[in-house]
Curated annotation (Swiss-Prot):
It is found in: Cytoplasm. The lineage of its organism: Bacteria, Pseudomonadati, Pseudomonadota, Gammaproteobacteria, Enterobacterales. One of its GO terms (cellular component) is cytosol. PANTHER family: 2-ISOPROPYLMALATE SYNTHASE 1, CHLOROPLASTIC-RELATED, HOMOCITRATE SYNTHASE-RELATED. This is 2-isopropylmalate synthase. Belongs to the alpha-IPM synthase/homocitrate synthase family. LeuA type 1 subfamily. The keyword Cell division does not apply. Pathway: Amino-acid biosynthesis; L-leucine biosynthesis; L-leucine from 3-methyl-2-oxobutanoate: step 1/4. Catalyzes the condensation of the acetyl group of acetyl-CoA with 3-methyl-2-oxobutanoate (2-ketoisovalerate) to form 3-carboxy-3-hydroxy-4-methylpentanoate (2-isopropylmalate). SUPFAM superfamilies: 2-isopropylmalate synthase LeuA, allosteric (dimerisation) domain, Aldolase.
């Protein structure tokens, strides 16, 4: 009988570390809800002791999750474990994940301790975590370069202390599949209490072997795989969960295992992570890249037309990728748009129909026909703009040419006021940004500007993602329009609203602190 492989997602913890700008609590919750809809068994959503923002994110997600088990990371430090437990305690089911370096290199150069010290720290921390929950994971950081005798000793000790999952990370992506599979085999053969815990693997992609290493580990007996959506992560990234999941599905007969993932949510979740994290998916990315199911060779096209199985080992529909349709125009009613969203897997709670339909009509008037990818882009922006806006772009105009300096006029709604400014700049986008900055007077520095097309052809929606630095903090904004200058302006306004909200949070914190002091 096929055994289950537990899918452990760490997009919101290990994956987020690769981003230039941190995700907001709202954005993290969006991703967490998508992961739960996809059916991940465990999601690691943060490192609570690292910052108040991470603590709040973990607590918010823990409160919302109903089916997926929520996990938080902690070093083998008492405070880390206590704070993680506090952030998680509201969850219906949670896991504390403690980790400690075990390789000789890390122990001597980073921890500057002996292996016996590390062994004692691991046992103490696992026991402390067990005081809060019966689900404790222990990770042997840099296990791939840890002497096997030491690895076996610390795994046995951690299990005796109460660890229910033992994670074997290839922290720097150093091992080969043959070598990594051998490590898992050795653990099963040499650790006497290994049957009392689930063996997990967490592979990085520095040598491009994270997925292969993970699958080989599963063949050797590992029953949990850790990774991120789209392979997001530091350096070369983590193991791509969508690749592992589909490899297990396509080769289930050979591997003898399965997952509980809803495969038809893979594509949608991948797209959401890509947009929110401002990390485009390469066209040739396995499973979710735009070319993953494309056939350009004449021989291949002929073979696919005769039988898709000639050159496709899985279908686009198996990951939730629908065929593009051309059925929506400005004459389409609200019910037609709602029906199409339902066909694409969206629920009423995923978007506001009134504002989505208004945006749809404006786009349909410009484009004539609105495609599925247009609707998905509009729904994404719709979700980002649910919170009240202090700033709203009311109007802009630009004059530019090859021999004249670009000039922009902008009208911005600022709370209850409407303010206007004009400015010149090095091109139309810069001119608009200069005018907006004159209105708001926020000290910001543009760190990243990225333009991408949502859709195909000359009338594709232009999506602009920007990252700005404001007083040492980085904020992300996104704008969408058929006009690049307009989408650029909307992206900056989105950033300004995020900065404004952050200021309001700080003001409220200061007010509460002052009230508490007065009460004392």
């Amino acid at each position: 009988m096929s055994q289950q492989v537990i899918i452990f997602d760490t997009t919101l913890r290990d994956g987020e570390q690769a981003l230039q700008a941190s995700l907001s609590v709202k954005e993290k919750l969006q991703i967490a809800l998508a992961l739960e809809r996809m059916g991940v068994d465990v999601m690691e959503v943060g490192f609570p002791v690292s910052s108040p923002g991470d603590f709040e994110s973990v607590r918010t997600i823990a409160q919302q999750m109903k089916n997926s088990r929520v996990c938080a990371l902690a070093r083998c430090v008492d405070k880390d474990i206590d704070v993680a437990a506090e952030a998680l305690r509201i969850a219906e089911a949670f896991r504390i994940h403690v980790f400690l370096a075990t390789s000789t290199l890390h122990i001597e150069s980073k921890l500057k301790r002996s292996f016996d010290d590390v062994l004692a720290m691991a046992v103490h921390s696992v026991k402390r975590a067990r005081n809060y929950t019966d689900d404790v994971e222990f990770s042997c950081e840099d296990a791939g370069r840890t002497p096997i005798d030491n690895l076996c000793r610390i795994v046995e000790a951690a299990i005796n202390a109460g660890a229910t999952t033992i994670n074997i990370p290839d922290t720097v992506g150093y091992t080969t599949p043959y070598q990594f599979g051998g490590i898992i085999t050795d653990l099963y053969q040499r650790v006497p209490n290994i049957d009392k815990a689930i063996i997990s693997v967490h592979c990085h992609d520095d040598l491009g072997m994270s997925v292969a290493n993970s699958i080989t580990a599963v063949q050797a007996g590992a029953r949990q795989v850790e990774g991120t959506i789209n392979g997001l992560g530091e350096r070369a990234g983590n193991c791509s969960l969508e690749e592992v999941i589909m490899a297990i599905k396509v080769r289930e007969n050979m591997l003898g295992v399965h997952t509980n993932i809803n495969h038809q949510e893979i594509y949608r979740t991948s797209q959401l992570v890509s947009k929110l994290c401002n990390m485009p998916i390469p066209a040739n990315k396995a499973i979710v890249g735009s070319n993953a199911f494309a056939h350009s060779s004449g021989i291949h096209q002929d073979g696919v037309l005769k039988n898709r199985e000639n050159y496709e080992i899985m279908t686009p529909q198996s990951i939730g990728l629908k065929e593009v349709q051309l059925n929506l125009t400005s004459r389409s009613g609200r019910a037609a748009v709602k029906h199409r969203m339902e066909e694409m897997g969206y629920q009423d709670k995923d978007y506001n129909l009134d504002s989505l339909y208004d945006a749809f009509l404006k786009l349909a008037d410009k484009k004539g026909q609105v495609f599925d990818y247009d609707l998905e882009a509009l729904a994404f922006i719709n979700k980002q703009q649910e919170e009240p806006e202090h700033y709203r772009l009311d109007y802009f105009s630009v004059q530019s040419g090859s021999s004249v300096m670009a000039t922009a006029s902008v009208k911005l709604v600022c709370g209850e006021e409407i303010k206007s400014e004009a400015a010149t700049g090095n091109g139309p986008v810069d001119a608009v940004y200069q005018a907006i900055n004159r209105i708001t007077d926020y000290p910001i520095e543009l760190v990243k500007y990225q333009l991408s097309a949502n859709g195909q052809g000359k009338d594709a929606l232009g999506q602009v993602d920007i990252v700005v630095d404001h007083k040492g903090r980085r904020f992300h904004g996104v704008g969408l329009a058929t006009d690049i200058v307009e989408s650029s302006a909307k992206a900056l306004v989105h950033v300004l609203n995020n900065i404004w909200r952050a200021h309001q949070v700080e003001i409220e914190k200061q007010r509460l602190q002052q009230n508490n002091q007065e009460m004392v």
